[in-house]
Swiss-Prot record:
Residues spanning the signal sequence: none
Family annotation (PROSITE patterns): RHO
GO biological process: (1->3)-beta-D-glucan biosynthetic process; actin filament organization; negative regulation of phenotypic switching; regulation of actin cytoskeleton organization; Rho protein signal transduction; signal transduction; small GTPase-mediated signal transduction
Protein source organism: Candida albicans (strain SC5314 / ATCC MYA-2876) (Yeast)
Pfam families attached to this UniProt entry: Ras (PF00071)
Protein name as annotated: GTP-binding protein RHO1
Motif mapping: Effector region: 38-46
Length: 198
């Protein structure tokens, strides 16, 4: 990915509903393989080197549990974050609703001033006939790009991106956008606005 040692270090925390695609996104980006078996995460850390705009950055990737059982444990991952990815799954409109109903308030509580990237995961399922039919039976449909963009605007996200960890489409762009957002904030405010757990 990057030649030579990274000049800068940044911490990225990824949150969102359980099974929305967070861990697959991190593993595909950091290790280049797609995990075929779903194992709920408690806490996992990965490291990846990213080069954006000629700058080498070591990105510490903090994976978190989306399940409610971990609501009291998850805030331990927020301190010193430089950028937050809030994820939802394109095949789960409920997971997008939860961005507004749960995730944004948690992130803003613990990470005031930290840039947020909204990420629509599993974008390959938007056109998948089985997914479309399963959602139709529940009077739902896959989340559209414009719906994702509207939520990103409502929560004040620095960016909105979609990706498919399964096909690899858009994965690198998510982390490049996140890295850029973390660098912009640092340049604007060297006071280092970081997450605080109260």
């Amino acid at each position: 990915m990057v030649n030579g040692p990274a000049e800068l270090r940044r911490k990225l925390v990824i949150v969102g509903d359980g099974a929305c695609g967070k861990t697959c996104l991190l593993i595909v980006f950091s290790k280049g393989t797609f995990p075929e078996v779903y194992v709920p995460t408690v806490f996992e850390n990965y490291v990846a080197d990213v080069e954006v705009d000629g700058r080498k950055v070591e990105l510490a990737l903090w994976d978190t549990a989306g399940q409610e059982d971990y609501d009291r444990l998850r805030p331990l991952s927020y301190p010193d974050s430089n950028v937050i990815l809030i994820c939802f799954s394109v095949d789960s409109p409920d997971s997008l609703d939860n961005v507004l109903e749960k995730w944004i308030s948690e992130v803003l509580h613990f990470c005031q001033g930290v840039p947020i990237i909204l990420v629509g995961c599993k974008s390959d399922l938007r056109d998948d006939p089985h997914t479309i039919e399963a959602l139709r039976q529940q009077q739902q449909q896959p989340v559209s790009t414009s719906e994702g963009q509207q939520v990103a605007q409502r929560i004040g996200a620095a960016d909105y991106l979609e990706c498919s960890a399964k096909t690899g489409r858009g994965v690198r762009e998510v982390f490049e956008a996140a890295t850029r957002a973390s660098l912009r904030v640092k340049e604007k405010k060297e006071k280092k606005k970081k997450c605080v757990v109260l």
